């Protein structure tokens, strides 16, 4: 049986939260339904808005100059927010998006962006798509390999393996990341139970993946740790909401920030959700 861990509540009263990023001692998050990016003080949960994104923000990441990249979901844009708050279009993702643009990870200036692949809220038929690669100068391409709802992205501690949540594929996939940022050798890293829909994820220093189990409430809702090959070792059950995203942070990089949203697919389609930030200590440190 997996080891169970408890959680504490840090903040509530949000819409649909996504893409937590711990950066410079603060927690940055997207709020889909309130169309804003916020920054939170992880000590007490207080927060403020730092950007309006009318077409709904999703994935977040940072460049070496301190500017922030923001995925704008509905119009398939990758935005760049400078330190002074000025926002410009970094890349147009539209030619490569099926459905909304989604979560993202930035590694050495390269952005890897997921997309739904189809109109989820509209009830369209499920379709495969491709992970999107955006170079530091804004060039966009589709990564080889058909994937099913590419979502959370993370770099393995080995520095050369990029991991991907395939939400409706019920698995964690992997690519080899080349020195120029391109991805090759798409493969399955861990098969998950059919009731697990991995969303946002993070990696600990031992190489285990912590992922959120989305689109489900009840006994299996929450967060899980899986090792390469599919062995689940730990879990944090959150039966009152979807598990959506997770990241390590804190002064010692040993606090898990858990993003949960109380909603259902019909409510999600109508823009209704109650978002929470929760925390857990699991005896491990983040890799990144």
Where are these regions (language model features)?
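Blade-level signature of beta-propeller repeat domains, shared across WD40, Kelch, NHL, RCC1
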Residues: 247-288
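Beta-propeller fold detector
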Residues: 48-52, 88-92, 141-145, 183-191, ...
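Beta-rich, blade/repeat-based domains predominating
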Residues: 11-25, 53-72, 94-113, 118, ...
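Blade/loop signatures of beta-propeller domains
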Residues: 1-5, 25, 34, 40, ...
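A short loop-to-beta-strand structural motif that recurs across blades of beta-propeller domains
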Residues: 36-38, 77-79, 129-132, 171-173, ...
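A short helix->beta-strand "capping" segment at the edge of beta-propeller domains
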Residues: 1-15, 45, 186-187, 280-283
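Short, solvent-exposed loop/turn segments at conserved positions within beta-propeller repeat blades
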Residues: 32-33, 73-74, 118-129, 167-170, ...
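Short loop/turn segments that connect beta-strands within beta-propeller blades
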Residues: 41-45, 81-86, 134-138, 176-181, ...
């Amino acid at each position: 049986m997996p080891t169970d861990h408890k959680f504490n509540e840090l903040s509530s009263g949000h819409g649909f939260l996504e893409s937590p990023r711990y950066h410079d001692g603060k927690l940055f998050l997207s709020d889909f339904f309130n169309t804003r990016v916020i920054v939170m003080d992880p000590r007490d949960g207080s927060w403020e808005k730092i950007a309006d994104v009318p077409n709904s923000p999703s994935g977040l990441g940072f460049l070496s100059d301190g500017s922030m990249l923001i995925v704008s979901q509905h119009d398939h844009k990758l935005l760049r927010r400078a330190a002074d708050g000025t926002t410009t279009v970094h890349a147009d993702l539209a030619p490569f998006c099926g459905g909304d643009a989604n979560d993202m990870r930035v590694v050495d200036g390269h952005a890897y962006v997921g997309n739904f692949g189809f109109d989820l809220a509209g009830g369209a038929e499920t379709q495969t798509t491709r992970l999107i690669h955006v170079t530091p100068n804004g060039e966009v391409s589709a990564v080889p390999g058909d994937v099913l709802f590419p979502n959370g992205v993370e770099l393995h501690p080995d520095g050369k393996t990029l991991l991907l949540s395939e939400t409706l594929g019920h698995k964690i996939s992997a690519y080899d990341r080349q020195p120029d940022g391109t991805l090759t050798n798409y493969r399955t890293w861990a098969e998950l139970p059919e009731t697990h829909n991995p969303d946002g994820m993070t990696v600990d220093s031992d190489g285990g993946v912590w992922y959120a189990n989305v689109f489900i409430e009840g006994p299996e809702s929450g967060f899980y740790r899986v090792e390469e090959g599919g062995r689940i070792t730990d879990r944090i059950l959150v039966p009152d909401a979807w598990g959506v995203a997770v990241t390590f942070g804190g002064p010692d990089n040993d606090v898990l920030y858990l993003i949960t949203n109380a909603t259902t697919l019909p409510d999600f389609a109508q823009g209704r959700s109650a978002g929470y930030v929760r925390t857990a200590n699991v005896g491990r440190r983040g890799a990144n």
